[in-house]
């Protein structure tokens, strides 16, 4: 006989679980404890493992799906099956675990296509950041989120996963207002025009979009956004608060994002309002060094504005917990670590503006929901719209635990996607633990300097994409994609790859093979 009793004094940490060994059973065995209000790390291993829950309550998250864990629950994990133990109760969650290596079962699991192993039968929603309709797409845009997401979706489908590519146009950006002023149009006209141009350029790039959401043209979007924002406000964490703000010294106009430039208070690089593209850290405009009104040498006036505010510094543990569950590149984790070293990190959720969706709440009649928090809802709305067209019952108001979300975006969007949005989802839907993978790209340079829509320093998609050239462009951008560091698009290098590799090597090889194959008459 072999009797083992649980002893809390001999526990040690493994994968975020307090563990102790049970010896002499012929298989690996032990006791496990997850304390109230905590979760284990997301982990997987080559053993088959069985849990028997003996006390407490919680959930088991297995490859993104959530299952209840109460006394009497027995669950077996196959080799390499990712799992998380989350204690949702007020007492310790205790379980006995038994594990062993079964080479045949492990081999069968590994033999499954990678997408099936990771995503199973779950719906997989792959988002490329909705572009701002203040201009068409250039090769810098196309090489980043859009080509990346397109290739990823194609690969998942080849491996049997149910995956879709979703994007749209980010109509309510302040950059649309500035573009409209410059072009002599209304913001609505500007967004409509460039949204159509963007969709056409994606088509020319042979990028198939399963759901393209045009936020200003969607009749159900505004009310859904207001519902989402109301949920966030009703959580009690987002409240109206007076804070420092910048104003035009002559007109008194409130300045944010596109309206103001200066020096990043964190890294010292040139930055626009609210975000630094270099270090990825947010600013509140008023903390920019040497700020100036865009298009003017005038220094803005410092004042105060009452806006909806999120004390993001209060959610460091929530963000770290979220990052433990999915694919999060090291650079995004480093960004989160830097930001949460700040004692205060207040983020405005609304701004005075005439362009955008006003919140439903009283007291901010001159304000709109800031477009970046808005985008957190926009992704869920895209899933709902896709589902409606497919006859599926997906709802932005009730996100489902088995949804797998995969984001593709440039590093300048990292703060919003990987830090702000998980917090907003937690406030709006506290019972939902979103399973999100993040794929970030660095900037593609053009002849050594940044592509820029606003400065018109770019090679526009429509200027290079034709039915004859699209494969060569896709190949070169994939070959030269800035996945971990900045890369450069050089016209001379593109011509060299086209003429020497694609035509001089590949095409000649195909032509030679065709000429030397025996004809039917010779066989």
Go through each PLM region and give its residues:
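Short, conserved beta-strand element in jelly-roll/cupin
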Residues: 45-59
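Structured secondary-structure scaffolds
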Residues: 112-160, 166-167, 223, 279, ...
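Short acidic-glycine-tyrosine-enriched beta hairpin
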Residues: 65-78
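A short, N-terminal "cap"/entry segment at the start of jelly-roll beta-barrel domains
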Residues: 1-28, 33, 41, 106-112
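N-terminal, positively charged nucleic-acid-binding surface of large information/translation enzymes
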Residues: 114-320
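Double-stranded beta-helix
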Residues: 25-26, 86-116
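Single conserved hydrophobic/aromatic residue that forms the stacking wall/gate
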Residues: 514, 519-523
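Short beta-strand His + acidic residue motifs that chelate non-heme Fe in jelly-roll/DSBH
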Residues: 42, 60-61, 77, 83-89
């Amino acid at each position: 006989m072999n009797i083992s009793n649980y002893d809390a004094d001999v526990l040690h940490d493994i994968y975020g679980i307090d563990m102790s060994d049970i010896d002499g059973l012929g298989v690996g065995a032990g006791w496990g404890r997850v304390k109230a209000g905590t979760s284990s790390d997301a982990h997987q291993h080559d053993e088959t493992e069985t849990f028997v829950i003996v006390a407490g309550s919680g959930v088991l998250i297995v490859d993104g799906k959530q299952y209840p864990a109460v006394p009497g629950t027995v669950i077996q994990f196959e080799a390499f099956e990712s799992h998380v133990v989350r204690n949702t109760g007020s007492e310790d969650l205790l379980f006995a675990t038994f594990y062993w290596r079964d080479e045949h079962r492990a081999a069968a699991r590994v033999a499954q296509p990678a997408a099936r192993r990771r995503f199973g039968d779950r719906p997989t929603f792959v988002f490329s950041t909705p572009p701002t309709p203040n201009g068409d797409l250039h090769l810098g845009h196309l090489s980043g989120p859009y080509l990346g997401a397109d290739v990823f979706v194609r690969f998942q489908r080849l491996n049997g996963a149910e995956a879709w590519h979703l994007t749209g146009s980010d109509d309510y950006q302040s950059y649309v207002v500035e573009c409209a002023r410059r072009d002599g149009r209304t913001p609505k006209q500007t967004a409509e025009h460039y949204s159509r141009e963007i969709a056409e350029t994606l088509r020319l790039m042979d990028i198939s979009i399963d759901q393209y959401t045009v936020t200003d043209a969607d009749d159900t979007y505004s009310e859904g956004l207001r519902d989402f924002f109301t949920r966030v406000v009703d959580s009690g964490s987002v409240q109206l608060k007076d804070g420092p703000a910048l104003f035009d010294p002559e007109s008194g106009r409130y300045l944010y994002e596109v309206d103001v430039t200066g020096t990043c208070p964190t890294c010292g690089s040139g930055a626009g309002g609210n975000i630094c593209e270099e270090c990825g850290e947010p600013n509140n405009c008023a903390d920019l060094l040497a700020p100036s009104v865009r298009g003017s040498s005038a220094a803005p006036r410092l004042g105060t504005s009452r806006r909806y505010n999120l004390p993001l510094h209060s959610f460091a543990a929530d963000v770290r917990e979220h990052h433990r569950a999915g694919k999060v590149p090291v650079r995004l984790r480093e960004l989160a670590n830097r930001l949460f070293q700040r004692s205060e990190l207040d983020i405005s959720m609304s701004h005075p503006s005439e362009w955008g969706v006003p919140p439903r709440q009283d007291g901010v009649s001159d304000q709109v929901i800031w477009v970046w928090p808005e985008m957190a809802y926009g992704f869920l709305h895209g899933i709902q719209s896709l589902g409606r067209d497919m006859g599926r019952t997906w709802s932005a108001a009730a996100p489902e635990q088995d949804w797998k979300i995969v984001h593709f975006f440039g590093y300048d969007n990292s703060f919003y996607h990987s830090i702000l949005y998980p917090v907003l989802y937690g406030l709006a839907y506290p019972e939902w633990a979103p399973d999100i993978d993040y794929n970030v790209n660095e900037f593609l340079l053009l002849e050594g300097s940044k592509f820029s829509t606003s400065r018109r320093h770019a090679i526009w998609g429509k200027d290079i994409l034709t039915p004859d050239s699209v494969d060569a462009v896709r190949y070169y951008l994939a070959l030269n994609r800035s996945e971990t560091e900045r890369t450069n698009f050089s016209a001379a290098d593109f011509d060299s790859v086209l003429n020497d590799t694609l035509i001089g090597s590949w095409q000649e090889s195909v032509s030679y093979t065709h000429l030397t194959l025996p004809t039917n008459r010779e066989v």
